[in-house]
Amino acid sequence: MKILFVDESGDHNLSIIDPSYPLFVLGGIIIEKNYAEEELVEIVNKFKIKMFGNSEIILHTADISRNRNGFERLIEKSFREKFYLELNALIKTLKFTAVACVIKKDTHLSRYGLAALDPYFLSLDILVERFCMEIGNTTSGGVIVAERRDPTLDHELDLAWLNLKIQGTHHMSAKKIEKRIIGLNLRSKSENLVGLQLADLMVSPIGRFVLGKSVKEDFKIIQSKFRCNKEGEWRGYGLVILPK
């Protein structure tokens, strides 16, 4: 069985567009369940213990960038450089496939106006399609795991998932989605799920890339993990940017 761990960057609300980050990014990693629950946990916990002395610390982009919640030592330049060097080396060795959808909110809104679909719904469609393609014809071959947030946002996500099971997507019928994916589970950050932490680390570098900012080592590694076609093309297969 495969697991799709998903996380987001940016606000999906079209009435709020930040000029410095006018994007909504929904990204995720597709990973084999046995690997995710055993070897992956062991590898990442070793990294945490090596860097911070314990495996309970939760890798979270917002905390890392703000030197808080256990990451206070990152304020030291030498330690910060070592941390990112070790983190990039770690992620490079891990076995997963990256998928993401980026919605350019300002362009999306100006093109479709009142008919513009909610960026979360639209990007979830894209990720579910690609997850189904990775699962293939296997019955109950996958499950989606997302981070629990607040009741309103969690309810919206439940509705988005229900909508997919009823209507399907442009390229994947509702019948195929329900056959291949057993459900969408919401889990708390405090549960320390490594898969969710890796998904969190994916989305910001992808957003920076789409904004045209300088490409750093973290995105180069993610790019090498993107789902791609037989020719190795990842644009449109692993990373979808909308509107086209």
What is each stretch, according to the model?
Residues M1-K244:
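Phosphate-ester processing/binding pockets and catalytic centers
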